Amino acid sequence: MKKTMGLIALLILMMGLVGCSGETVNIDFPFEVGDVENIEVYRYAGVPVSAEKKVVVAATDIANLYDRFEDLSLKEKQVEEITGADVTSFRFNLSDGTNYELIYVCNGVKNGKLKSFTGNFEYFTSSDIGSYWFDIDLEAVPAEESELPKQPD
C-alpha cells in the first residue's frame, strides 16, 4: 500500500513537472480577417536569393490562412536556428495601408520557430507551417531579397 501511494505521488509530481515545461499560446491577430486585402507568401531554402513569392487574393484563401494561424499551438521555448534553414514568410497587407508579418524558420522535423516583429513575439511550434506554401495553389514567381519580411540581426 505504501509503495502504491508513493508511486501515485511520484506520478502526480512528474505530470506536474511535464505540464510546466512550456505554456501553450495562440496568435491573437490585432486585426480581423476582413481587414486583409492580400497575403504575400515567400519561401526560400537556405539562401534568400532563391526566394519565391505567391500572392493570395481570394477571400476564402485569406480566411483559410488567417484561421490556420489563429488555431496554431505555440510555446515559449528557445530553439537554436540552423544556418541554411527553410524559411516561409507571410505579409498580411491590410486595408488601412499597414501590414503584419510572420516569419517561420524550419529547423527540422517538428522543430520550427514562428516570429513576428510587427507582433513582437517569437514562439516554438511543432506545426509544419512551411507546408502552407504547398497548400496554396498559385503560381510562384521569383522574389527579390529586398521584398522579404525583415529579420533584425
Task: Specify the residue positions occupied by each region the protein language model found.
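Positively charged n-region of N-terminal signal peptides that target proteins for export
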Residues: 1-6
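Repetitive helical segments and hydrophobic/amphipathic motifs
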Residues: 11-12
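C-terminal motif of bacterial Sec signal peptides marking the signal peptidase cleavage site
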Residues: 15-19
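Function-determining sites in protein domains
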Residues: 20-153
